[in-house]
Structures are given as structure tokens and as C-alpha cells.
């Protein structure tokens, strides 16, 4: 039990160290549109609460508030889960970038979570 607690503390410390580079890390189940956040800003967690746990609805709220108008199509494209699934099923990753209204460039990389569950994917946002 003590080792498990220490491993949890180590993981939390590691996340704190790398957090400035990572804007968010999510595990998404495309079949349910539900997600787990590994690392998320409080604003996104609030959107998730308002959207009752729907990742796509929370992302649309985020898009409308933060994403520059010229890049909203990028968000819409990745919210097409069939498109994302087809890219991942072909052995590739989805790798897109968009700008926030404040000019910050955000990179989103989407990968398969595992080979055993085709519905799960990892969404990593970096700046």
C-alpha cells in the first residue's frame, strides 16, 4: 500500500513538472463521447460539467470561447469521430494545430489508447 501511494505521489509530481508544456491530456471513448482527463485546465472541466460529461459538447464550448474563428474548422474536423477513427485505424495519428484568440498556437495529437480497444484514444494538447 505504501508503495502504491508513493507511486501515485511520483506520478503527480511528474505531471506538475511537465504540466506547463501540456495544455490537456484526455482519454476519449468515441462510442460514448465520454472521457477521462489526465491533465485539464479548470475552464475545460467546467465545460465538461455543463455538458454533463460529453467531450464533443465541452469542446464546442471551448472552441466558441477560445479558438480563433480561422481555426474552428480544425476543431470541428477532430470532433468527427469517424474521421479520427479512420486515421487511427490506418496506423496513423491525427496531428493538427490551431490558434487561440490570444494568438497562442496549440498542437493536438490524437493516438490510439491501445490495440485492444479501438474506441479509446488519447488526445494530447501542447503549446
Task: Please name every model-derived segment.
Residues 91-93:
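Extracellular Ig-like/FN3 beta-sandwich strand-entry sites
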Amino acid at each position: 500500500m505504501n508503495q502504491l501511494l508513493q507511486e501515485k505521489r511520483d506520478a503527480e509530481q511528474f505531471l506538475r513538472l511537465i504540466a506547463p508544456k501540456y495544455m490537456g491530456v484526455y482519454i476519449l471513448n468515441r462510442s460514448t463521447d465520454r472521457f477521462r482527463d489526465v491533465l485539464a485546465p479548470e475552464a475545460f472541466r467546467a465545460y465538461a460539467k455543463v455538458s454533463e460529461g460529453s467531450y464533443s459538447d465541452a469542446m464546442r464550448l471551448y472552441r466558441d470561447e477560445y479558438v480563433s474563428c480561422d481555426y474552428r474548422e480544425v476543431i470541428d474536423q477532430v470532433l468527427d469521430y469517424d474521421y479520427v477513427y479512420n486515421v487511427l485505424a490506418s496506423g496513423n495519428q491525427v496531428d493538427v494545430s490551431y490558434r487561440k484568440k490570444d494568438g497562442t498556437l496549440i498542437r493536438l495529437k490524437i493516438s490510439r489508447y491501445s490495440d485492444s480497444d479501438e474506441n479509446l484514444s488519447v488526445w494530447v494538447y501542447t503549446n
